[in-house]
C-alpha cells in the first residue's frame, strides 16, 4: 500500500464530555468492537477489581475518574483508528485542550438526562475554534432523560451549532424499545433476539405503542423544519451529526462507529508559525509533542513524549530536527499504545500518535522536522494557574527523589513550578485543587517522596522581563519568583494587589502568559 493510501486510512479523534456522561464507557465499547479487549470494563467503582482500560493510572482506578489523556489504537473496517480519551474533570482541562490540538475530529458525549453541561461547553468551544468536525453521541437512553427534540434545541442554542439526527430513540428508560435509524433506513431493536428490522415492519412491531407514534411525528417534524444533511457542513464543523444510544448496554455504539468512520475526516494539515499549512500527504516527516507523561511504566521511571505525526512517515532510527533547540535527535525507541500497554513500532504515518522515549530532551509544544525543514507549528494553548501552594519534602533524606519527581511531573504540563527568588522555596501553581491531590499522590506512589503542601493565599501570576526585575518590588502582597525556565514572575494575592502593583510601577510590563 502506498504512503498516501496509508495516510488516508487514518481516523484520529478525541472523546470529550462533562464528567460522568459516559465518555470512558463508550471508549471501552469502541475498543471492544476494534478487537482490542474481550469485554468492556463497565465498572469503575473503587471497590471492584475491574477498571476501564483507558484509566491506567492508580489514582484513576481508585477514584473512578480520568485525570490524564489516554491514547489507544485499533483497526476496524479498513481504517486505522486512533482514539484519545481525555479527562473530563475541569481541573485537567489543560491536558484536554492540548490533546484537542492533535486530533482531526471530536466525539462529544452528552448525558440524555443532563444535556449540555459546563465542561462540555468549554471543550466544545476549543473544538469549534479549530473548526474540526464534532460528532455527538447522546448517551444513557436506558435511563429516563429529556425529550430528544429538547436536546437538539439545546445543542443549537447553547453551543451554536446546527444538528442533524442520524437516528431517533423509540421510548426511553424502562420504556426504551430501540432506535429509528434515519441514515441507514432501518430499525435497531433494543429487546428480543433480532437486532434490526425494516422500517416497513415498524407499525406491526410497535402496534399500539405510543412512543413509536411519537417517533413518527417527531421525524415528520424534523423532515419539514430540521436542518438538511450535508457532509461538507460536517467536515467544516458547522453541522454535528447526532446519534442516540446507551454505552453501558452497548446499544447503538457499533452503528455510531460504522457511521462515524464513514464521515470522519482523513488527517488534516497543521499551520506553522509563519501561516503555512503542512500537507499531511507531504513526503517529509513532521510532528509535534502535545503531551509528556512520566511513569507509564513505574518500574522503569520512564517518560514518554506523545507526538502527533503531521506529515510523511516515521521510520525507526530516523534523525529529526528539534526546532526549539536547533539540535538533532534520533527516534529509535518509539512505541504505540493501548492506554498503559505499549508495543515498539518500526513505522507510522501522518495521523498516527507515537510515543518517543524521553530523557528530558522534549517539551510540550516541540516541533520535529527532517532535512532542511526548520519550521515550527503554532503553539499549544497554555493556562494561567489560579491556586498556589508551597511544597517541600517531608523527609529531608528524600531530597533526590523529591527533585526528580517534581522535575518529571512539572514537565507534563498539568502543574507549574516556581522558585521563591529570595528564600529558594518551591511553589506550585495549578488550575484546580484536584491537580495538587494528583501531584501529591503520584509523588508518594511513583517516587516514594512524601511531600508537605501549604496553601499560599496567592491567586494569580504575571511574568515580567529581566530588564524590569527589581527585588525591592516584593511585598507582603506579592512574591517574586522564577518559573522552571528561569523567567521572573510575580505571584499576587488578589486582583487588588495586582492593580496596586501596576499603578505603582506603570513602566513594568506584566504578561499573563510567558
UniProtKB/Swiss-Prot annotation:
One GO cellular component, as annotated: cytosol
Origin superkingdom: Bacteria
Pfam families, per database record: EF-G_D2, GTP_EFTU, RF3_C
Primary residence: cytoplasm
Gene3D superfamilies reported in the protein's UniProt record: P-loop containing nucleotide triphosphate hydrolases, Peptide chain release factor 3, domain III, Translation factors
Gene Ontology MF: a single term: GTP binding
Record keyword Cytoplasm present: yes
Entry coiled-coil feature ranges: none
Keyword terms: Cytoplasm, GTP-binding, Nucleotide-binding, Protein biosynthesis
Boundaries of every tr-type G domain copy: 8-268
Example of a GO biological process term: regulation of translational termination
Residues that hold GTP according to the record: 17-24, 85-89, 139-142
Localization (cell): Cytoplasm
InterPro entries (alphabetical): EF-G-like_DII, EFG_III/V, G_TR_CS, P-loop_NTPase, PrfC, RF3_C, RF3_dom_3_sf, RF3_GTP-bd
Role noted for this protein: Increases the formation of ribosomal termination complexes and stimulates activities of RF-1 and RF-2. It binds guanine nucleotides and has strong preference for UGA stop codons. It may interact directly with the ribosome. The stimulation of RF-1 and RF-2 is significantly reduced by GTP and GDP, but not by GMP.
HAMAP family: Rel_fac_3
Family: Belongs to the TRAFAC class translation factor GTPase superfamily. Classic translation factor GTPase family. PrfC subfamily.
Family matches, as PANTHER family: PEPTIDE CHAIN RELEASE FACTOR RF3 (PTHR43556:SF2)
Record-given protein name: Peptide chain release factor 3
Organism of provenance: Streptococcus pyogenes serotype M1
Amino acid at each position: 500500500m502506498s504512503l498516501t493510501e496509508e495516510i488516508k486510512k487514518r481516523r484520529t479523534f478525541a472523546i470529550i464530555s462533562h464528567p460522568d456522561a459516559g465518555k470512558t464507557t463508550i471508549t471501552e465499547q469502541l475498543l471492544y468492537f476494534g478487537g482490542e479487549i474481550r469485554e468492556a470494563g463497565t465498572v469503575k467503582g473503587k471497590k471492584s477489581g475491574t477498571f476501564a482500560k483507558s484509566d491506567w493510572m492508580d489514582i484513576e482506578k481508585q477514584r473512578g475518574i480520568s485525570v490524564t489523556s489516554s491514547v489507544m489504537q485499533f483497526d476496524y473496517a479498513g481504517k486505522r483508528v486512533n482514539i484519545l480519551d481525555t479527562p473530563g474533570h475541569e481541573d485537567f482541562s489543560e491536558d484536554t485542550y492540548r490533546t484537542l490540538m492533535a486530533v482531526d475530529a471530536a466525539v462529544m458525549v452528552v448525558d440524555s438526562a443532563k444535556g449540555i453541561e459546563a465542561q462540555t461547553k468549554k471543550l466544545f468551544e476549543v473544538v469549534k475554534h479549530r473548526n474540526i468536525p464534532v460528532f455527538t453521541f447522546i448517551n444513557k437512553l436506558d435511563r429516563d432523560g429529556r425529550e430528544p427534540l429538547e436536546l437538539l434545541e439545546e445543542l443549537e442554542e447553547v453551543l451554536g451549532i446546527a444538528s442533524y439526527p442520524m437516528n431517533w430513540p423509540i421510548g426511553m428508560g424502562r420504556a426504551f424499545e430501540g432506535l429509528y435509524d434515519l441514515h441507514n433506513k432501518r430499525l435497531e431493536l433494543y429487546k428480543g433476539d433480532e437486532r434490526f428490522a425494516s422500517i416497513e415492519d415498524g407499525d406491526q412491531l410497535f402496534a399500539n405503542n405510543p412512543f413509536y407514534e411519537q417517533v413518527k411525528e417527531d421525524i415528520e417534524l424534523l423532515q419539514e423544519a430540521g436542518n438538511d444533511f450535508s457532509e461538507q457542513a460536517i467536515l467544516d464543523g458547522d453541522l454535528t451529526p447526532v446519534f442516540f444510544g446507551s454505552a453501558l448496554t452497548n446499544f447503538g455504539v457499533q452503528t455510531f462507529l460504522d457511521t462515524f468512520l464513514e464521515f470522519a475526516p482523513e488527517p488534516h494539515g497543521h499551520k506553522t508559525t509563519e501561516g503555512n499549512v503542512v500537507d499531511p500527504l507531504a513526503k517529509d516527516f513532521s510532528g509535534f509533542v502535545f503531551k509528556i507523561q512520566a511513569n507509564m511504566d513505574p518500574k522503569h521511571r520512564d517518560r514518554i513524549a506523545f507526538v502527533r505525526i503531521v506529515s510523511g512517515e516515521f521510520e525507526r532510527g530516523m534523525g529529526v530536527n528539534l526546532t526549539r533547540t536547533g539540535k538533532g535527535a534520533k527516534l529509535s525507541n518509539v512505541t504505540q499504545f493501548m492506554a498503559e500497554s505499549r508495543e515498539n513500532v518500526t513505522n507510522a504515518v501522518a495521523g498516527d500518535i507515537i510515543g518517543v522515549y524521553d530523557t528530558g530532551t522534549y517539551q510540550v509544544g516541540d516541533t520535529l522536522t527532517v532535512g532542511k525543514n526548520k519550521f515550527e507549528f503554532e503553539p499549544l494553548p497554555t493556562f494561567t494557574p489560579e491556586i498556589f501552594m508551597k511544597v517541600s519534602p517531608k523527609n529531608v533524606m528524600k531530597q533526590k527523589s523529591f527533585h526528580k519527581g517534581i522535575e518529571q511531573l512539572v514537565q507534563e504540563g498539568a502543574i507549574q513550578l516556581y522558585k521563591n527568588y529570595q528564600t529558594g522555596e518551591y511553589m506550585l501553581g495549578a488550575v484546580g485543587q484536584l491537580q495538587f491531590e494528583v501531584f501529591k499522590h503520584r509523588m508518594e506512589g511513583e517516587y516514594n517522596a512524601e511531600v508537605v503542601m501549604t496553601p499560599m493565599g496567592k491567586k494569580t501570576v504575571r511574568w515580567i522581563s529581566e530588564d524590569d526585575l527589581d527585588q525591592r518590588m516584593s511585598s507582603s502582597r506579592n512574591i517574586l519568583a522564577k518559573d522552571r525556565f528561569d523567567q521572573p514572575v510575580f505571584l499576587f494575592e488578589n486582583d487588588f494587589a495586582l492593580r496596586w502593583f501596576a499603578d505603582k510601577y506603570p513602566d513594568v510590563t506584566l504578561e499573563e502568559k510567558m
